[in-house]
Amino acid sequence: RTLAMLAANDRPLFREGFGPSAQGFTHVEWGDIENLKNKIGKHVAAILVEPVQGEGGARKAPRGYLKLLQDIANENGSLLISDEVQIGMGRSGTLFAYQQENIEPDIIALAKGLGGGFPVGAVMAKAKVGDAMIPGTHGSTFGGNPLAMRSANAVLDLLLEDDFLKSLRENIIYFENKMDALINDDDKVSPVILRKKGSGMLRGFQLTENITAGDFGNISREKGLLLVGAAENTIRLLPPLNTSKE
């Protein structure tokens, strides 16, 4: 299972040192629907997509892209899988990121925010998929861990509180405005920030050639701010969902 997920990732950095690589995965250019159409057919079991890429450089799927993916999957009898490990559980401004495109994936992968800091992962699936997952087709060393389940329930209780997501969306707008101000402070274009990226509370700054994401992260850490880099020379910003404007 671990080798399969490594093969699903298209970054050699994560696959180096592990092998042999699982076969059967085809990678397509992000957001390029024609590229996808040329590589998919009735032989494809499923399309796996991350609505907002984290490691890929805080890249949000173009408007309408997820709906096109679902249409293509339906036409070919393929499943649509939404990877919500990083963007799910409210980080997009809705409980799940796919909800903003009004689609219905067949499978959803969750982790990270699901446990609020405690290690936990989950897979949700439609009945037609779940019914096929008989004992032995899927396994987990710590599946159903009581402490992990309690942590996930606590997170869900908070996210589903009245007005929590509404307040979060207001903070997302405030956050985005502050990002704009950093790029164009007093109409002076930043010498290191090229543009903002991402969506919701998964944001990023693509940096100019003047500095690498690694160096930017090191400088930030020295000043007491922990940031993480990503593809396309991007620095990611992932504040807690309960962060206040102050």
Could you tell me what each predicted segment is?
Residues R1-E246:
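Conserved N-terminal phosphate-binding loop of PLP-dependent enzymes in the Aspartate aminotransferase
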